């Protein structure tokens, strides 16, 4: 680094400290490590991590970064699974500044709770908690909310979710900053709320909670994926119901993946479903679940609340390696989970510096902790696990409960398999077990890191008319794997496929073989975790990124695109 650059950076960092206070600026690599390292994988260098305390401070920090020609990486909870929330390596052509929005966690309820205004650090959990007394729910419930994921992070990555009727996270109403073609920072207010003219007026009004009912307009723009229920019912369509790069779901902040700095989003909320009932379905024939899905989506008057699939293998892995997660949520509640994940992240970062500790110490310790407790799953679930390879957790509500029960009784008079009507405790534990599955494969890999090469995690969206949903791998690929773990959102045909790879296997080459097979099946990937730095963005998505960020100063390199200024390619 030249002396001029060092001097310039010193002045720049002094300016950031002046804007937010020195206690809200980190430059020591040891202290910035947990913000530079991804939730599952991925890391890189950063000049600084800065924590603005108001939207106006965020605007001023952005302006300082643009003036100093720095790369800007917006980060909220850093719970992304595909490395899109952190720097990627050290081959950028400019310094990287991470702007953490964790302090900007306000939430504004509009009207009687039919809509909300979420800020950059608002978490799904805090939104869920605020809406509960109003009898309403956000787009996403148990899942991302338990690990402190942010609302805006979900919008920016059009995240999915387990709720069949709500589709991917989406809005057409947001407030965002964009760096234009001339390298100038501009603030765009498309919230449909009168907040003033200048950035200072607009942001101060939000910071001070000075929004009146008269300021809010209802002009026909959508604050959720309004036609998803029609798409998911179209079982003859030759395309997936939802996936990250769907061109029809890319709109300004929605799907921007950090190419815009999003200050606020306006979102619809949903009436909480009452009188819910879980049906636990088991079969040894995949085509039975195919028939159930197609019949329900095409013929039921009432769509399911959720329909979650688990294969017996992930059932077993989750029972053993997701036990501590299950017990913590079951005994302590979801509100404690963000704290524990945060604590684990801090502990891991600290222990990495101590040579005495083996890698994944906290995972190994929590695994041993889980063994101290007796079996946690209900007897009827265990019985179904022994009988059946394929499991479907079908949750219905209201009139849908009777509709599903009468049809399932008739259907299983001739179909292979069976179902039982869960008690409230069984239903809760069944879905909690399914949630624990999402982290169980990672835990398995961490505990057995000496014996396995890595985990290859894919999330895929199948065509809605596909009847061959259950994967059969060729022997040359199957022989490279220790475990194949299949689970997902069955009604939406979105599957999480985690492969535990044998020691010594080239994981990158294996992944390319896997993706080739998925392309042959007409699947889209990723389905809901977004491209991050692990997947190549398709051309339509790259075009969207270029339109949002013409100078390539915001989260460059995402989707395996250029990291260089003005989208220059490496020669």
From Swiss-Prot:
Ligand binding (FAD): 76-80, 84-85, 143, 150, 160, 262
GO biological process terms, semicolon-separated: aerobic respiration; anaerobic respiration; lactate metabolic process; respiratory electron transport chain; transmembrane transport
Its membrane topology: Peripheral membrane protein
Reactions listed under catalytic activity: (R)-lactate + a quinone = a quinol + pyruvate
EC id: 1.1.5.12
Coiled-coil spans in chain: none
Keywords recorded for this protein, A-Z: Cell inner membrane, Cell membrane, FAD, Flavoprotein, Membrane, Oxidoreductase, Quinone
Regulation: Inhibited by 2-hydroxy-3-butynoic acid, but not by p-chloromercuribenzoate, n-ethylmaleimide, or 5,5'-dithiobis(2-nitrobenzoic acid).
Matching InterPro entries: D-lactate_DH_C-sub1, D-lactate_DH_C-sub2, D_lactate_DH, FAD-bd_PCMH, FAD-bd_PCMH-like_sf, FAD-bd_PCMH_sub1, FAD-bd_PCMH_sub2, FAD-linked_Oxase-like_C
Region (Disordered): 546-571
Superkingdom: Bacteria
Function according to Swiss-Prot or TrEMBL: Catalyzes the oxidation of D-lactate to pyruvate. Electrons derived from D-lactate oxidation are transferred to the ubiquinone/cytochrome electron transfer chain, where they may be used to provide energy for the active transport of a variety of amino acids and sugars across the membrane.
HAMAP family documented for this protein: DLDH_Dld (MF_02092)
Protein family per UniProt: Belongs to the quinone-dependent D-lactate dehydrogenase family.
Protein name listed in UniProt: Quinone-dependent D-lactate dehydrogenase
Species of provenance: Escherichia coli (strain K12)
Gene: dld
